[in-house]
Design a protein with these regions (language model features):
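Active-site and donor-binding regions of nucleotide-sugar-utilizing enzymes
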Residues: 11-159
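Well-ordered, non-membrane alpha-helical segments in soluble/globular domains
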Residues: 21-24, 54-55, 93-97, 231-245, ...
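Short, charged, surface-exposed secondary-structure boundary motifs
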Residues: 49-53, 145-151, 290-293, 335-344
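A nucleotide-sugar donor-handling region in carbohydrate enzymes
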Residues: 138-230
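Conserved catalytic-core segment of nucleotide-activated headgroup transferases in glycan assembly
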Residues: 203-264
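Catalytic donor nucleotide-activated moiety binding site of glycosyltransferases and closely related
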Residues: 248-289
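A donor-sugar binding/catalytic signature common to diverse glycosyltransferases
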Residues: 292-339
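Leloir-type glycosyltransferase catalytic cores
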Residues: 337-452
């Protein structure tokens, strides 16, 4: 008697339109095997989901919808709990899997998962519920180049087969999940660009996006909401973006604020624009009918310059669209990020190391002509990321110590010091912990004798 092979259902977990576009590109590129059914599991991770549009309600989503057989809301599934704050109790995991198989019509299908940010909920919760399912992790931003932010349960980490990521920094391999031997796989850039083109051309995707000829596009991130800087400092950061763009000769400015940013920032920028003699358009809720991806603006407006702090969109502008880019404020963030293992550290480091400051006219002009970031030796960049990654998560990546020591011994200078903290280097006994002028002390016989004497007296007491 012949037994039919088991059905396979692939569940794709997404919380952003950009992430869904990454998944769509991976599907179009053949990165996933055929399956009997594909479900897009949508999560709205906003602080107050009820007041924010879910990604499946955003303009342009319909262009991506056809890749999936069904769309399911994770928020509805676990209501009234918030996706970022809920996970199943260990004893309840079998009950939850049984419930979801019934609710989603999965039956006895073999399950395969594709999730983002597996180290935290809600993606971690989904991976925990489907205990035996193999997992593919996809990363759509710069954080993929950094270390895993938390130690992942081996019962989850060892199930991860690969890391799908965009080639935002050519030649640099992601650190994420390498502690489990997970191999990275690039989602082809040309396929991703094609998907973004579909988003830009979709009905309603450009509603309210004004046709401004070759403006300087300023990207807001609402960093104060993350506790990285104060609201006043972030407002000043936006004004610095404006002044820098105008100093480079741009008088038509378009500001894309974070969807939840305070309206008073836009007013302050309007006043500054008048002083600078510039024309400012703010793409807020008074202009747009819904949030729009920066990449849609790149195709619609073809900006002459893109300015931001450490947004991934700076790299997509430079690497994928060949647009001139400039950074503002990374030096402040490198100093302020706390604790040192803050997961934003690698994105800020990459932007600071590879993209030009808005005050550097020549470098900004080169950034567009070169179609990519400022050239940095691959070994130097890999060494920098390895050193910062080890300093961030030494317990997760102990194998990176030799690479970190080599980099610090050879490259620690006035330029690279901003990526490290002396206290951190000291706690890890890394090069640079002791100032160069005092480096002779550990090798001095007299100093060693005094230290031993003091140590003995302390022990006796």
């Amino acid at each position: 008697m012949n037994t039919a092979p088991p059905r396979t259902t692939q569940i794709f977990f997404a919380s952003t339109l950009y992430g869904t576009a990454t998944l769509a590109a991976a599907l179009d590129a053949g990165c996933f095997a055929d399956a009997d059914r594909r479900i897009l599991l949508v999560s709205n991770n906003a602080a107050v989901p009820e007041t924010t549009a879910s990604l499946d309600a955003m303009p342009g989503f319909d262009a991506l919808r056809g890749r999936f057989d069904d769309v399911v809301s994770w928020n509805t599934t676990i209501a009234p709990f918030h996706p970022g704050g809920w996970a199943p109790r260990p004893d309840d995991v079998p009950l939850w899997e049984r419930h979801l198989r019934l609710a989603w019509g999965l039956g006895d299908d073999d399950i395969e998962l594709a999730v983002e940010s597996i180290q935290v909920n809600p993606a971690l919760a989904v991976a925990q519920i489907f205990t035996g399912a193999p997992v593919d992790v996809y990363a759509d931003g710069l954080m993929s180049y950094g270390p895993t932010r938390n130690k992942i349960d081996p019962l989850v980490g060892t199930r991860v087969r690969r890391l799908l990521h965009l080639d935002l920094v050519p030649g640099l391999k992601p650190l994420l999940l390498t502690e489990f031997g997970v191999a990275p796989q690039i989602v082809p850039s040309e396929v991703f660009l094609k998907v973004l083109g579909e988003l830009a051309d979709a009905p309603g995707a450009q509603d309210g996006v004004l046709s401004v000829e070759a403006p300087a596009l300023l990207l807001g991130q609402y960093l104060s909401a993350l506790g990285l800087i104060s609201a006043a400092e972030e407002e000043e950061l936006h004004l610095r973006m404006m002044r820098g763009a105008v100093a480079l000769g741009h008088t038509r400015l378009v500001f894309k604020p974070h969807p939840t940013a305070p309206a008073q920032w836009s007013r302050a920028m309007g006043e500054e624009a008048e002083k600078l003699g510039a024309e400012l358009t703010v793409l807020d809720e008074g202009v747009l009918t819904a949030p729009v991806l920066a990449e849609v603006l790149y195709q619609r407006m073809r900006p002459a310059l893109v300015v931001g702090c450490f947004s991934t969109a700076l790299f997509t502008a430079s690497a994928f669209y060949g647009l001139p880019v400039a950074r503002v404020g990374t030096e402040v963030l490198l100093d302020r990020l706390a604790p040192y293992e803050n997961s934003n550290r690698i994105p800020v480091t990459l932007v600071d190391a590879l993209l030009p400051e808005v005050t550097d006219r020549a470098a900004v002009e080169r950034s567009g002509a070169a179609r990519g970031a400022e050239p940095v030796a691959a070994a130097d960049l890999t060494g920098l990321v390895s050193a910062v990654g080890f300093a961030m998560q030494p317990r997760i990546y102990p194998g990176l110590r030799p690479a970190a020591e080599r980099y610090l011994a050879a490259h620690l200078d006035t330029t690279t010091w901003r990526y490290f903290k002396r206290k951190r280097l000291t706690s890890l006994a890394l090069p640079g912990a002791v100032p160069a002028q005092l480096a002779f002390l550990p090798r001095n016989a007299v100093v060693r004798r005094v230290a031993r004497s003091v140590r003995r007296r302390v022990v006796r007491q």
